[in-house]
């Protein structure tokens, strides 16, 4: 019998540092692409850990891995890709669909009447895929203090503990 030493590891989802020469500005498209890449990388880490294929992770494998998960309908892995959205007055109508989504958290500040309204949505990639809301990725942003923060944690435990752990719906992965 092999004894398992229980442990955990917090898997942070964060964009790679983009090195920008001092005389150059980074465009918003490049920022959005890197934020989306960080979502893909997080999904790949969760998926490859689950499938015991971590050795296949490369610098360029994440997007292809996520596309395969979407195509094959393996939505559980997509839940690990946290998406933070920032909505303004022009995109305000998008906000309300997240208010009624049980897997999203929507907060707002300011007042619509004064034109100072901002919406802060925390959701996951599975919500966007299953509801056909991928167009909303144009609003992707880094998490701000108004966003609900999410983390992914890798637990190492024995089989008996894992069966108890996943009996709760929020932990059924």
What are these regions (language model features)?
Residues 1-173:
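A conserved ligand/cofactor-binding region detector
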């Amino acid at each position: 019998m092999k004894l398992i030493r229980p442990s955990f590891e917090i898997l942070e989802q964060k964009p790679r540092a983009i090195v920008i020469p001092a005389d150059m500005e980074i465009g918003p498209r490049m920022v959005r692409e890197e934020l989306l890449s960080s979502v893909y990388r997080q999904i790949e880490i969760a998926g490859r850990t689950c499938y015991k294929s971590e050795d296949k992770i490369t610098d360029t494998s994440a997007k292809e891995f996520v596309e395969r998960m979407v195509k094959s309908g393996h939505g559980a892995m997509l839940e690990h890709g946290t998406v933070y959205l920032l909505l303004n007055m022009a995109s305000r109508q998008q906000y309300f669909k997240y208010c009624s989504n049980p897997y999203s958290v929507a907060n707002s500040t300011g007042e619509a009447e004064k034109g100072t309204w901002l919406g802060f949505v925390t959701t996951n990639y599975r919500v966007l895929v299953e509801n056909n809301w991928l167009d909303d990725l144009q609003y992707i942003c880094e998490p701000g203090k108004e966003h609900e923060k999410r983390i992914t944690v890798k637990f190492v435990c024995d089989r008996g503990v894992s069966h108890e752990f996943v009996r709760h719906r929020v932990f059924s992965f």
